[in-house]
Structures are given as structure tokens and as C-alpha cells.
Amino acid sequence: MVQFSIGVGVLVLSAMPLGAAAQAETLLQCSFANGKTVVLETDETGVAYRFGRPGQTPELTLHRPYDQVDVTPWPGIGRSIWEDLSLHNGEVTYRLWGALDRMSEDHELSAGLIVEQGEEELARFECLPNSVNYAVFSFSDAYEAAGYCWTHEDFTWQEACE
């Protein structure tokens, strides 16, 4: 994997294996008010993240194997059915979330991206409502398809499923 650091390490570009993009399945895609987009995809090797302006080279591309990705599944309560997925790049975490408002008539989808360094929030992007391409439970489903299962006793994912 090739990596380039720019600035203070907040922006790191890494090259994905060529074969990874060919069989990718989109988990989340949306546009933000600033004209940029985020795409989150999965393949047999892990999760890929792209952020930047459409039609241009992405500002940030990450690819992480499943054992380096954190997925928080919906706990089963609340107005929204939601989940989030976090990818780490050094000390910076890119947390993407998707939700469905189950109490509204239209069952509106929403999604977004939160960039954090430790406990500090560096940036927050809300997806434009009409741009959200997200299927409820797709983060958890992708993790399960990769061979992980959620344990309700200790609220963790494990590789050895019974």
C-alpha cells in the first residue's frame, strides 16, 4: 500500500489494490453542501472510502481490511434505525453513519460523516437528503458477510461465529 502524507498528517492518501474496486459493493454514497461526495464500498478484502469532488481525483482514499474497521449496529431502540462505521487513519477517525427515521411518514434516510482526532471533532458533514444512497443495515450486513457476528452479551464483533 502506497501512502503519502500532506500537512500535519490529517490528509493521507493510499492506493487501493486494482482488483478491489472491480468487485466493490456500495454501502453509502452521498453529496454534501460543499460540493464534495463520500463513497463507502466493500469487497472481499475490506472497506474502501473515497472523499472529494465528483469527477476529480479523490482528496482522500482509504482501504482497510475488515479487522481494522469498527461497525456499531443499531441497538434496537429509538426513533431511527441507524448504524455507523469507523475507519482509522493514524490518529484520525472517519465515522460514517446512516439512518432511517421509522416514525416519519416518508421513512426518511439520512447519513453523514464525522472526522475526529481523539475526542476532538475536526469536521462534520451532513449528506444532502436527495443524494443519500444507503440501505439500512448495509454496514452490519457487510461485516457479517465477511464472517463476523455480533455478540449481544459483550456488544462486540467476533470472527468465530457459532
For each predicted feature, which ranges?
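Bacterial N-terminal signal peptides that target proteins for export
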Residues: 1-9
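C-terminal segment of classical bacterial N-terminal signal peptides
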Residues: 14-21
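Cysteine-centric segments in proteins
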Residues: 22-162
